[in-house]
């Protein structure tokens, strides 16, 4: 009797969630699937017309560009955010004083509204934005910067070779030697600037339009637009902190004995990362990549906020294509929007299936 009552109570608590899923997922998916085979346009009752909406969608140049943009965006962004999230989690996994503060600080971009972040990036990459300003300053101060870096590298090399000649341990990035090299480079650069040998150059303001119709091409084929590249940078910036938490949780489950054994064998930090950390985090990496692919293939809000600030072809994604076909003036081709949404769902499903089939660790299947 107690077990039966307990089961009923559990289902009562689950009922609101199950009802919401049934209405907003299964029912909505069923309606979208039905409309994708009709001529529905919001003004006339739907009539079945077979696969014509799918043929129209696949033949639409904007859909083809949206599909290409979505695939490139998903592959590039997922790769970048996975790599940076892993490296950041390894860096923040050290037991140092104040590490909790840095973990919280690095997580801030993920709790900030994506709309706000998009507006900030629009400001950063406008024609008179911070990006162009920094490039202008780099061009103006390039002689001083290159001189400083060259003197620093030379001084560091001389010090390291001198210490090793005296049979003393010295690394190329030894902090004490690096401080001396930086001081020498700073003094010499100042002296050369003071005597007029080198100095700040007069350069025109760097004027690059990041949200124009500009593309990175491969063999004459448009691969990645510059506006979409800006969105990739922004999306990576906002999603890395969240994915970092998954890697941090996975790092806690790696036995310390493995790292101790690697230290005994004389493994370098890079070897420990590639031979110990990465293999042990493979199930977590599968989850991170899966979440990343699903999220990036459905990316919509950043493109919607940018809107007309960039040409439509440079930023349109599958999710934005569905939106623009659903909410437009006149008889909106909702059937084409539904067909595109079904195709997007099938692509995501295929990606996850292939990844689970070929790239997941055996432990994740158990």
Predicted regions and their residues:
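N-terminal signal-anchor/first transmembrane alpha helix
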Residues: 1-49, 71-75, 83-110, 114-117, ...
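Short membrane-interfacial helix/loop motifs at transmembrane-helix boundaries
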Residues: 5, 18-62, 69-71, 124-129, ...
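Interhelical loop and adjacent transmembrane-helix boundary motif
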Residues: 6, 41, 56, 61-62, ...
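Start (N-cap) of specific transmembrane helices in multi-pass transporter permeases
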Residues: 61, 65-73, 90, 110-111, ...
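Hydrophobic alpha-helical transmembrane segments of polytopic membrane proteins
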Residues: 78, 82-86, 153-156, 228-233, ...
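Non-cytoplasmic
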Residues: 115, 128, 240-247, 284-309
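Membrane-interfacial helix termini and adjacent extracytoplasmic/periplasmic loops
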Residues: 118-236, 302-315
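Intracellular coupling helices
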Residues: 244-286, 364-366
């Amino acid at each position: 009797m107690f077990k039966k009552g307990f089961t009923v109570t559990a289902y009562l608590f689950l009922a609101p969630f199950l009802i919401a899923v049934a209405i907003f997922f299964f029912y909505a998916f069923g309606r979208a699937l039905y409309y994708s085979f009709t001529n529905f346009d919001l003004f006339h009752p739907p009539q079945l017309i077979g696969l014509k909406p799918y043929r129209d969608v696949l033949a639409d140049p904007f859909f083809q560009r949206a599909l290409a943009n979505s695939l490139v965006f998903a592959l590039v962004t997922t790769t970048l955010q996975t790599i940076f999230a892993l490296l950041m989690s390894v860096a923040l996994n050290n037991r140092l004083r104040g590490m909790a503060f840095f973990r919280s600080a690095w997580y801030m971009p993920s709790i900030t509204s994506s709309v706000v972040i998009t507006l900030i990036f629009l400001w950063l990459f406008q024609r008179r934005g911070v990006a162009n300003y920094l490039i202008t300053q780099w061009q103006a101060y390039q002689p001083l910067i290159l001189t400083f870096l060259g003197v620093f590298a030379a001084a560091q090399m001389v010090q390291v070779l001198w210490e090793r000649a005296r049979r003393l341990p010295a690394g190329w990035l030894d902090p004490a030697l690096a401080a001396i090299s930086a001081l020498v480079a700073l003094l010499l650069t100042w002296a050369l600037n003071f005597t007029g040998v080198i100095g700040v150059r007069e350069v025109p303001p760097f004027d690059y339009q990041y949200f124009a119709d500009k593309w990175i091409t491969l063999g004459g084929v448009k691969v990645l637009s510059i506006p979409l590249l800006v969105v990739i940078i922004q999306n990576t910036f906002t999603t890395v902190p969240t994915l970092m938490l998954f890697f941090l949780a996975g790092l806690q489950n790696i036995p310390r004995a493995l790292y101790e054994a690697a230290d005994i064998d004389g493994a370098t930090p890079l070897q420990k990362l590639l031979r110990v950390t990465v293999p042990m985090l493979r199930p977590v990496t599968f989850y991170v990549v899966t979440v990343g692919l699903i999220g990036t293939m459905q990316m919509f809000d950043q493109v919607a906020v940018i809107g007309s600030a960039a040409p439509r072809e440079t930023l349109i994604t599958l999710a934005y294509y569905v939106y623009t076909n659903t909410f437009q003036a006149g008889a909106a081709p909702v059937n084409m929007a539904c067909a595109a949404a079904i195709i997007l769902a099938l692509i995501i499903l295929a990606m996850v299936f292939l990844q689970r089939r070929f790239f997941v660790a055996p432990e994740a299947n158990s």
